[in-house]
Amino acid sequence: MNYPTTSFPARSGAARPGEPAARAKTFPEKLGLGAGQLGLDQPPSTYRGRSPEKESAEILSIAARAGISVLDAQVSFGQAETTIGRIMPRPCPFRVTIKAGRCDRGPDYIEDEARAALRRLRLDKADAIMVQAAGDLFGQHGEAVWDRLRTLRDEGLFRAVGVSCFASDDPVGLTRRFKPDIIQAPVSLLDQRLIVSGALAEIAGMGVEVHLRSIFLQGLLFLPPDRMPTALKGASGPLSRVRRMIAEGRSDPLQAALGFALSRPEASSVIVGVASAAELQAVIAAAASPPPDLDWDEMALEDPAPLADKGWAAA
């Protein structure tokens, strides 16, 4: 999962007057929290003197109080799931999403891992289970794994089964073939490929839930010019132009990124990752503000380097 790797800057200024005030009433229903950035699957460390577990407990508490509806608990290791299960508010206030195990190990392994993940999270059932790589469904066990996941859904273990994919995975073709309940894909203010192509609208038109991830494009919009990776130097000019347009619209990068994603009519959920309680509070404040009046179409990057599906490492 690609969640932002750069701390959010301080927000600058209020929303523009005259914009719809109803935004604050609707954002929690769309906003989801990704657990992959919490650091629970990393070696023990501290954040400003606090352990990742204590920081994560506060993050989950803030999310619950704010009415954030989705907890995407697709983490790398079972220990992280165990920790989330221990610190999650009870009764669980979230619609929890978990990841499916490795498809190449077959359907029995997938089912065993799914049930084990629920035990670690201390849940009887979860909202959704996601196949992590669309290509896995075309492997030796792909069809059998998908059939097993749908069986688990029909038995009530999950409400929905879905696939996490990239723009290069042909999400529309994937949806037509496998008929998932959820498609999760990277879409952002800077990466609008699935919007421009009409893929997102077509998928939503099939009755499939669309969950947006990577809405901060790994923090690229927040990255200072002097920290731009060498491979992305060519994007410096377009990024400066986008930042200027945002500033001229009396907004800031965080509010613009969230406003764009949350206002997409195709999206059922918008998943964000945070590393601290302060970051989540900044996200909630920005999301509750009316979306800025900006020309979204003009902000999409055309340079393929920052949009590469394999991502890049922020230097």
Summary of predicted features, one role per range:
Residues 1-94:
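N-terminal binding-site loop/beta-alpha segment at the start of enzyme catalytic domains
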Residues 9, 13, 134-314:
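Beta/alpha (TIM)-barrel catalytic core signal, keyed to glycine-rich beta->alpha loops juxtaposed to Asp/Glu
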Residues 23-27, 84-93, 115-124, 174-178, ...:
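Acidic (Asp/Glu)-rich catalytic clusters
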Residues 33, 63, 71, 84, ...:
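Conserved, mostly hydrophobic/aromatic
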Residues 40-54, 99-108, 137-139:
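Active-site mouth loops of central-metabolism enzymes
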Residues 48-62, 106-121, 166-173, 257:
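Short, acidic/polar
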Residues 82-99, 147-156:
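Alpha-helix-loop-beta-strand connector modules within alpha/beta enzyme cores
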Residues 118-137:
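Active-site groove signature of glycoside hydrolases
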